[in-house]
């Protein structure tokens, strides 16, 4: 990893959880992100999980895999899973990975 990585969780109190990811998502941090998303998706009180990439500056294939892992676990537990605010090279990485159809990539937001 060449840059900082931070994650902040916000619970809206009504079953919605927003995971805000900042910095770079690469191989060095992808496992940690996967575990964070899995943990959030497995919480009984969660109905909708949003991963906000508005301040994410880089994502490689390992980062894409983390999002897909989080989505898979969320859907298995009956949760909605949304990736929001994918911009610039992060959006391009999601398109290049071929997950646009699966994640419904649309106007800076990814929804599943």
Regions found by a protein language model. Give the residues of each.
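STAS-like cytosolic regulatory interaction modules
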Residues: 1-58, 68-112
């Amino acid at each position: 990893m060449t840059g900082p990585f931070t994650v902040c969780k916000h619970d809206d109190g009504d079953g919605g959880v927003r995971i805000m990811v900042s910095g770079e998502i690469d191989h060095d941090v992808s496992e940690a992100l996967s575990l964070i998303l899995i943990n959030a998706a497995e919480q009984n009180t969660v109905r909708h999980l949003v991963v906000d990439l508005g301040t994410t500056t880089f994502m490689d294939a390992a980062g894409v895999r983390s999002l897909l892992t989080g989505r898979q676990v969320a859907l298995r537990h009956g949760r909605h899973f949304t990736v929001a605010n994918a911009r610039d090279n992060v959006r391009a990485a999601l398109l290049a990975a071929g997950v646009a159809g699966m994640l419904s990539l649309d106007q800076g937001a990814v929804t599943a």
